[in-house]
């Protein structure tokens, strides 16, 4: 059989190929039987054209299959009902003056280092407290102690006190008695009520802080009107705050009762098995 007849026969065979594998096998058979380079070049053009057609056909099949899978996924997503529960943040938190009470670990537990003004900022969706002078920031994960005080010449504003540790990036959670918390937030003289309730611990706090910058910062905190109860009172609860450093300590409640002449008796719970006398 001449090369011309072989070319026509193999061209017909290549055009009838239904898969890339079949097309490749027939082209290899033609290469073995045809020796003329010009004839092979013409045959290669037929081979290349059919190969493109088969690849395009295969591509369209894959594309159609992928579109079906996408539709199934979209339908599955539509069938899933997600209920988003939005936690409303207390609006008073944004209008309040923010202070961080920096605590330090020692042999007895925790003691307050100082009280410093902080700025409430938002960073990558997180509310954070930033103290630029210290070059430190803490993520707001706990409710602060909110105090209400009068604003000259009229009105009122809130003071939020957050408890933090130097090397711990989150604020600490303190849960005061609900009755005390209600008074501290709603009462006009909230700081005075709180300080009166723990005034008996004032000298104990001074004894633990000692003298120097720490004592000066505590006095400044009181003078600024934040109240002894916040500036000093919580700083003396070394044993009560020790459990905050551990994630696996079981919290217990010890009740302390202090009676004053200006207000009825309240209870201040402590989250430790050690009581404060």
Swiss-Prot record:
Pfam families: B277. Residues 256-277 are annotated as: Disordered. It comes from the Viruses. This protein may be involved in virus assembly. Essential for virus function. This is Uncharacterized protein B-277. It comes from Sulfolobus spindle-shape virus 1.
